[in-house]
């Protein structure tokens, strides 16, 4: 098998078998909107058969690391569209990795009013970097209530729809 030979992966035909793994890069703006530097970054890697994006928050509550992107509002979708267009112009394919960080978060890295929620109210060990205060201890999350689960599922459904509207070729969960 030649790593440079095409590969059919579901509905996608990749030009080669090289797949770029997702990497958290912290290059979005303070509103979780992808920036121009991200357009260049992904364009430069479009010769891979498939790019899996960095983790993209499906909602404001899904954010937790500083300067990570979302895909839950029109500005974010438009910015991702610029990125996917650049990748496609170079012959590449790209899927969105949807990521809710759960308990690994800092309120300093989240929009005002969003919460740190997780499957249980168990604090993760360790620290997380914030632009405002450097390394900070991970916070106590609030346990997600059973009746809240449908709303989280809807956030993922909406984020999937937004990813396709933003030009992604697929979604990774």
Task: Set out the residue ranges of the language-model regions.
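Acidic/aromatic-lined carbohydrate-recognition and catalytic surfaces
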Residues: 17, 55-112, 146-147
